[in-house]
Every structure is written in structure tokens, then in C-alpha cells.
Amino acid sequence: MTVTTRFAPSPTGHLHVGNVRTALHNWLWARKHGGRFLLRIDDTDVERSKEDYVAGIRADLAWLGLDIDAEERQSARFALYEAEFEKLKAAGRVYACYETPDELEVRRKILLSRGLPPVYERKPADAPVPEGVAPHWRFRLDHDAPIEWTDLIRGPQHFEPTTMSDPVVRRADGSWLYLLPSVIDDIAMGISHVVRGEDHVSNTAAQVQMFAALGASPPAFAHEALLVGTEGKLSKRLGSLGMASLREQGIEPIALAALLARLGTSDPVEPVTDLAPLVASIDFARFGRAPARFDEAELALLNQKILHHIDHAAVADRLPAAIDEARWKAIRPNLTTVAEAADWLPVFDGPFVPTATEAADRPVLRAAAKAALDIDWSADPWHALTAAVKEATGAKGRALFLPLRRALTGRDHGPDMAELLPLIAKEAAIARLTSAGGS
């Protein structure tokens, strides 16, 4: 059996961190098992589906590095749904219903007021059919067939169909709801594993019987705990936190993937620089049922750690041309986003205005300007410079290093000066030291 997973978003909005996590886990599982990862655009809602959102979905997956093996569109498969629907109708597994939404709501409230579950009550076969009313269609659950499956995350699952309403699968206008087309496509596309949020568990219960009614075995299911915010609650922000927003914040795609791959497990989140370790470690048996906490502060910190190790080639297309590999390696330990690299261009190439210096520091700076004239800039100039200044002035520790850093970079903190100074032209460094030292 070829492991085949699918990510099936509706193109009615932008992706957010919750459904991106689902896409990632489907992709990781397929790649771990040498299988296929499909993108299925669930665009049965023709009115609300937009091509701009489809393009955005593709772009977001590409940004994350999640390559797809095939793309399908539900809107191109209506003929297949119609044919399978007719088979179910002939077998008595779908039936027409004529209640209005208001009538159904009244019935629901009555049942709840009696302390009863609001389960849809089937009408007798000989119930009169109202004239001029187009029916909607429900799937008839088999009340004599308990629904069971072993979830890869939640373990054994059991549902009694007598406690469930027959689900609506087709509206009165002929349009399709989610449940039945999804099952038909999963069968036709050979989906072996369905990985999705735990809010789909009740859908799965109904779909298990749909698979059987269509003569197919259901795939394996893995229902993930939903993402919550740092306070342990569902967050509107998480529902709207899209990839564009994260890109604007300077989040690296591998940082987001590294965090989302491990959320919900007890495994540590590690600052990996490619997807391979995440592929190797994906294991649904390690996922728990407790809500998975998504912390933007944790993501930002992870992003920073990853930047400290990421290769120049991985970010070169987003760097100023003047930030070559040597400069990148020097400054990356001090960056929180790639965009901050541009802030270091004046340090390397100017124009540069040194910070005001204190009188007590000027002897150190004048000695440094003089010593720099005779230093070989290609052979560890920082250690040669500090040694010469220390010998000439007796300065050491903070009194030696901080004035030099300020004069050369205009900052109190930053990269290792032993790595940074060789990347500043000798003439520029001498000019800065001379200016800061005064007369």
C-alpha cells in the first residue's frame, strides 16, 4: 500500500496556523513513508470559493517547503459525486427530507427542553410530501452497526449511530456539503491516512459508514488536538494568524515548521535548519490529547535560534548584495530576523557616525588609531589591536573592549569583534578610531 495523505482546504479564506499544522503533519507522514501528498481544493461552495485564495494556499505551502504530488479540484468532480449519490439513493442510504431550517430548530429546542439529545427524527416512509418544496438529502445511518475505529492519536473510538442525526449531504439547491464528496474523493484518490483536527471526530463517525456504504474500507484516521493560545483557550488570533502576517514578522518557514511539528507531543522543539529531522521524527503515537499551546513568543525565540545556524545560501535571495557569506556568518548570531541584516551595512561600509565618546576613553581610542596603522588586517586584526592598545595604555577588560566596539560599530553589543573587524576596511576602521579619539 502506498501511503497517501491529503490536505483539503476550502478556498474561502487564507490559511492560518491551525490548518497549516494539519498540512505539515500530512506532508511529514507521507514523506516519512515514501508516499504521496495531495492538495485537494474543496471548492464545492462555488459562491464563496475564490481563485485568489487557491493561489494563496499554493504559495503558503511552497513557502513552507511542502511540495505536492498532485492537485485536485472538487468543483471538477461533480459528475462523480452525482453517480455515487445515485447509487446510495438506489440502495436506500440517502433519502429526501422536506423540513425547513425553522422547523428543525423548533424540534431541536423541544428535545433539549426535555433533556433529550437533539437527534434528527426520521419521518415515516409514507409521510406526505409537501408540494413545491425541493428536498435536501440525508445519509441514512445504519442503527444496527456500531461505529468503531482505532484512531492513531485518540485510540479506540466508539459511536452508537442511534445517538447521531442522519447527516445532511446535499442541499435543496443541489449543492454538496462536505461529508459525502470527501469520502468519494478519499476512495477515488486512494487516501490511506486522514490527518485532521479533533473537531472532525463526529464527522468521521458518520463517514465510516459512508465508506462502507460505498463498498470501501475507511482510511486510518489521526485526529489532532486543536491549537490554543498561551492561556490554554481557543484564540481568535490563532484563527486569523496567517502566513502573510508571519512573513511580515520575519518568521522563517523552517521555524514555523519546527514548532508546529512538535506541538502536541512531549518531544522538544529544536532549532532545525531543514525539514529532514521533522520527517524522521513524525509519530502520531507521540501526540497527546491535551490542547496544543501555540506561543508566538516561543516561535520568535526559535526563529532567532535558527537564524544563528542557517546557511547564507538559504537566505541570500533576501539579503542585500553586500552581505556576503563571511558577513552573514559574523552577524547572524545577533539577528532576530533576516531583515535586520541590512542594519549592519553602515557598520561594514558606512556612512558611519561614531557615538559620542567619554573623555576617559579617548586615550584608548587614540592608541588604537595609531596601532592600527601597522596591523596586518588579513591576520586576526582584533587580537593584534587589543594587545597593542593594552600594552600602550594598560587598559583591559570593559575599559578596553567597549570603547573600541563603540568607535568601530556605534553599538554597545554585537557580533564577536574578532569576526567583525576583518570585514571592515582598514582605512575605515582607522578613520573611525581617529574620529572617536579626538585630538
UniProtKB/Swiss-Prot annotation:
Q: Which residues cross the membrane?
A: none
Record-listed E.C. numbers: 6.1.1.17
The sequence motif named 'KMSKS' region is recorded at 233-237
Question: What is any one of the record's Gene Ontology cellular component terms?
Answer: cytoplasm
Q: Where is this motif: 'HIGH' region?
A: 9-19
Q: Which UniProt keywords apply?
A: Aminoacyl-tRNA synthetase, ATP-binding, Cytoplasm, Ligase, Nucleotide-binding, Protein biosynthesis
- Major place of residence: cytoplasm
- Organism superkingdom: Bacteria
UniProt subcellular location: Cytoplasm
For this chain, the family text in UniProt reads:
Belongs to the class-I aminoacyl-tRNA synthetase family. Glutamate--tRNA ligase type 1 subfamily.
Q: What is this protein's name?
A: Glutamate--tRNA ligase 2
* Source organism (scientific name): Sphingopyxis alaskensis (strain DSM 13593 / LMG 18877 / RB2256) (Sphingomonas alaskensis)
